[in-house]
Amino acid sequence: MEASMEVSAHRGAAFHPLAPLGRSWRRMRRRPRATQVRTALIIIAIVVGLIAWLVLAPTGMPGGSDSAGAAEVASSSTKATPPSQASTSSRGVTGTSINVVFPVVAINSLAGKEGFAEDKEYNEQIPAIHLYVNQINNAGGINGRKINPIIVQYDPTNDANMQALCQQWTQGSPAVFAVIDGIGSWEQDDQLCVTQQGQTPLLSAWSTTTNWTNLGSPYLWWTGPDMAPLLDALVQWGVSSGRLGKAVKLGVVVSDQAPDQDALNDFLLPDLKKVGITPLVQTVAGSADATATTNSDAQLAVEKFKAAGVQSVIPLLRENAFFPYVAAETAQQWYPKLLLSDYQSSIEVALGLIPVPYEKALNGQEGVTTETLGGIDDNRPQSQGGYDPGVRACYTTWHAYHPGPIPGTLYHYIEEQGPIQAWCGVIGLFATAAKDAGKNLNRRTFVEAMSKITNYPGTLSPTWTFGPDKFYGPTQYQVVEVHNNEPKSALCKMPKSGIAQGTCWVTVQPFKPLPASG
């Protein structure tokens, strides 16, 4: 769903620190480039720790950039391996079938229960996978072969189990040809386990910066954006909008985790240097095991930004660190301009944290996104905010199979950034590349075919284009505003139900090409 309809229920209510979780989870689940599944439990712990911190901690407690050590990062000098050098192994392919793994977070795991308790589409993931795989198989399959879907439910908080699954898929039985991660819950080092170590193709919605695909190349392909060109776009927009400039004091708050440090040092800082900007950088502990340190670091970062006269802030934080940082801004009643983005899903997560409890910190903030945020969940014309062609095709197939409302919902439409369209899009993408690879399907022919896909109708993003050295799909970005629709206005598109949206993303600037990567 594009927005929360729970505004009235929270008007006049006392602050409850867990209140925003249900709303925010309906946005966080979309990326993946997002760490949303792992973060379900993390944020609950953060809230408890944050309350204690805000009540008990004195100002100026040690923390911040001096106490949060950066994890080892991948070098930006790492070069991508071209598809032409991929393995020619056909492991997982027989004369009649292609074994493909579909990892799905187990609904009976605590992470699944907490993370998706209010997301009714989440319960439809396995039926959706079967539906879209069967659609391909019933139409003749892939050059005479049928996809054999191996749906594996797992607990994303159990790292040892995920490592064991990776080894089973890439080395054990049954042999697996590829892994498809529709919603982006198979992330970070687990991606590299499958691709770099296991030399097994992985299509995933979770993304970070170029270094990751370089390490996983030529087997790692993202339906989300590479964050290197996205951060470049963020800086360009920041300058053009007046949020960044030599006369504007800029702060960057970044976690100590390897992908975030990599994004800062290898991409964001060089982008800022090109336009003559030197930011004040504050580091916040980002580990799920460092909740107390994260809270104190966030508090101190805000204190230092405030004392230095910072006017704009770029967050490079996972949800478990972004949440305490915004809470610290609110506690200190200091509200700078935030430059949000798809990086760690800050533009998506922000909508879930208004109007309660962080409206002052987040309402009206803007950012860049490659996603189709700002639309509506129905089949009205695309020009009026309805589905893009890729999502519309997914909806048509789903509605023919499931003409009634999804259980627990009132309407039969699928979510524009929800899990059904995400699985539909990536399954179709895989099938296209596998067909283009021809009868001699192996790892090399598959990734070579992936590298030749252009202008493919995307789902989370309007189109996907790949290349021999372009391992991510999105090609465009837009600027959107996080908007609390109170009083009700036409800024938020009216659903067909006639019930106005409580919050929404409002398009500020239409889609334009992403800067070239590298």
Which role does the model predict for each range below?
Residues S76-S87, R91, N363, S451-G518:
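Solvent-exposed, acidic/polar segments of extracytosolic/periplasmic ligand-binding ectodomains
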Residues L21-V47:
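N-terminal export and membrane-targeting signals
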Residues Y411-I414, A434-E448:
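Short, charged, surface-exposed loops that flank catalytic or proteolytic processing sites
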Residues N123, N138-S217, T223, G286-S296, ...:
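Beta-alpha junction/loop-to-helix N-cap segments that form part of ligand/metal-binding clefts
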Residues D66-W169:
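N-terminal extracellular/periplasmic Venus flytrap/periplasmic-binding protein-like
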Residues G224, E329-W423, V508-L514:
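Extracellular/periplasmic periplasmic-binding protein-like sensory domains
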Residues V176-T283, K337-G367:
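Extracytoplasmic ligand/sensor domains, especially the bilobed periplasmic-binding protein
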Residues V47-P58:
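Hydrophobic alpha-helical membrane-insertion segments, chiefly the h-region
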